[in-house]
């Protein structure tokens, strides 16, 4: 098959790992021809480019800044990107007959591209629903439900759902949310297809190497290390992380490692500079291999979500924690099911964002846990990953929706 993938995440190689890289690599491994369109943002100061890696073609097309920029430019970029991507399809891939078009949210503004490819080629369309916009912006007080902007984007959201032949949601709570808030949608085309990766074989790190990595990164040898890694933005509700660090500063059993980048990084760095916490360390975003090395010496992975969310987020940062056998501590709003799923699979604990007493209890529970029980949580984490979040499973779910498993000649 010829498969078109539209994404806001810049992809110019499949040699690195990530949820979209891994999924495209899985499709490629089955012999499909892959065409990926993704941005080259204005801040990179580079022109559009087309490159090839085996049976995978990468069109990195110049756009406005989309990621980690101010809300005004992000808004203009979101509005203009479907026109930019559509020009890219017409200019670079006009001679390709696509069988399937895959796309993820954000953004919700790919409708014209999808419609063009479906009408031209009779292609099937599959939405990987990773974000529910504009409601997430309403939750974060970035727009009002009564305003023109919300109504405009809500219409765009409806159009995207309507044009999608199938919609893959990250979790059951995601699916139920879509049903409840979009009653006209055909329920048969909405299914659960969670974030997924191709995990690496797990190898335990020796005590000697573990100590060396800790020393290199200024981490304590004799404390449980709780890592928060990933985006540092408003949706993560990181004030609760800072409150947690402050509330446990005198506890000798635990240490917090915060690794990432995002719109809130400068504010968090300022807080670290002003408060100089002795039980925590902040590191700017790292290359994936360096970040993976750090995770090998950490004990518990942390997930934070803003308390005001009404949409059920399911952050992909869960997957690398599980890959490295880290038990998970989730601090989230009451509408997501990520915490209940972690507890159901016995690989961690969940608390409501803002409940500092329950947070301290969960932290103490990890620190005081017997080694045998903690090891069981670690094994449960890896099992949870391998049973639910493999790209091979995501691939089969997509192919099954269109009954394409045995029809690669399309």
Model region roles, listed by residue range:
Residues 40, 173, 193-196:
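Carbohydrate-associated surface elements
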Residues 48-50, 203-219, 372:
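A short helix/loop element that forms part of the nucleotide-sugar donor recognition site in Leloir-type
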